[in-house]
Every structure is written in C-alpha cells, then in structure tokens.
C-alpha cells in the first residue's frame, strides 16, 4: 500500500514540478 501511495505522490509531484518549470520558461 505504501509503495503505491509513494508512486502516486511521486507522479503528482513530477507533474506539479513540470508545470512550474514550463511556467518559468
């Protein structure tokens, strides 16, 4: 359960960071 939760959070964080990087560019 923890692994799947971490994977989900990781994907969510990656998307959020990607959006921030795109907005900066």
From Swiss-Prot:
Keywords: Amidation, Antibiotic, Antimicrobial, Cytolysis, Hemolysis, Ion transport, Membrane, Neurotoxin, Secreted, Target cell membrane, Target membrane, Toxin, Transmembrane, Transport. Belongs to the cationic peptide 04 (cupiennin) family. 05 subfamily. One of its GO terms (cellular component) is extracellular region. This is M-lycotoxin-Hc1a. Changing residue 21 to S: In B9; no increase in lepidopteran larvae mortality at day 1, and 97% at day 2. Changing residue 20 to H: In B9; no increase in lepidopteran larvae mortality at day 1, and 97% at day 2. It comes from Hogna carolinensis (Carolina wolf spider). Forms pore that permeabilize the cell membrane. Promotes efflux of calcium from synaptosomes, causes hemolysis, and dissipates voltage gradients across muscle membrane. Potently inhibits the growth of bacteria, yeast and Leishmania. Is lethal to lepidopteran larvae. May function both in the prey capture strategy as well as protection from infectious organisms arising from prey ingestion. GO terms for molecular function: toxin activity.
């Amino acid at each position: 359960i923890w692994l799947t939760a971490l994977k989900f959070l990781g994907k969510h964080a990656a998307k959020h960071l990607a959006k921030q990087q795109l907005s900066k560019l």
